[in-house]
Structure formats: structure tokens, C-alpha cells
Regions:
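Active-site region of glycoside hydrolase catalytic domains
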Residues: 1-107
């Protein structure tokens, strides 16, 4: 796009679904961090041009192997110019599974 239209802008569209811990318990805070990372990952790759360390660790810990070529790495460096949101909502996360289903919001 930038070669064809130098002033053109390329963006992405994400769901803004930020989660907050239901309590200040460390396990709720950690669970919230994990939950937010699971959806922020897509924007991180598109805006920063590389797979973030936390997802590389997730892939490694879960036996997921990606075949990424040098050409793929180069293509990822072509980042978006802006991020847009199609929908915004918040919810709460807790490490307690039963309560977590009630606290998560409408998705």
C-alpha cells in the first residue's frame, strides 16, 4: 500500500475486551494477565512486527511449533499504522472456575 499510495494508512480492527481481576488476590491478578495476553497477542504481532516473548513461551510450554521463515519474519516487520476497535467491553477474571463463569461478561 505505501508504495502505491505513500500517504495511505493500513490498520487492523480488534475487539477491545480488557479484563480486570475480580479481587486483589495474586492468583486473580495472574489469571487476568494471562487472559488479556490471549487476545492482545494478535495486535502485538501486527503493531510490533514480531511474536512477543510471552507467546513464544506459551507455544514452547504447550508443544506448539511454528515454521517461520526469514521471509515470514521480514513480512511481519511491515506493521500497521493504526489500531481500531470494533467493540469495547470489560469483564472480571478470577482463578475460581465456578465464579469465573459469572464474572466474565457477555462473551
Amino acid at each position: 500500500c505505501h508504495e502505491l499510495v505513500p500517504e495511505g494508512k493500513i490498520g487492523n480492527m480488534l475487539l477491545g475486551g480488557l479484563m480486570y481481576p475480580l479481587s486483589c488476590k495474586p492468583e486473580d491478578v495472574f489469571e487476568t494477565l494471562q487472559e488479556n495476553r490471549s487476545w492482545q497477542f494478535f495486535g502485538d504481532v501486527q503493531a510490533r512486527g514480531a511474536y512477543p516473548g510471552y507467546m513464544q513461551r506459551y507455544f514452547r510450554d504447550n508443544g506448539i511449533t511454528l515454521t517461520i521463515t526469514d521471509a515470514d519474519r521480514e513480512a511481519l516487520k511491515t506493521t500497521v499504522d493504526f489500531i481500531s476497535f470494533s467493540y469495547y467491553m470489560t469483564g472480571c477474571v478470577t482463578a475460581g472456575e465456578a465464579l469465573n463463569q459469572q464474572a466474565r461478561g457477555n462473551i
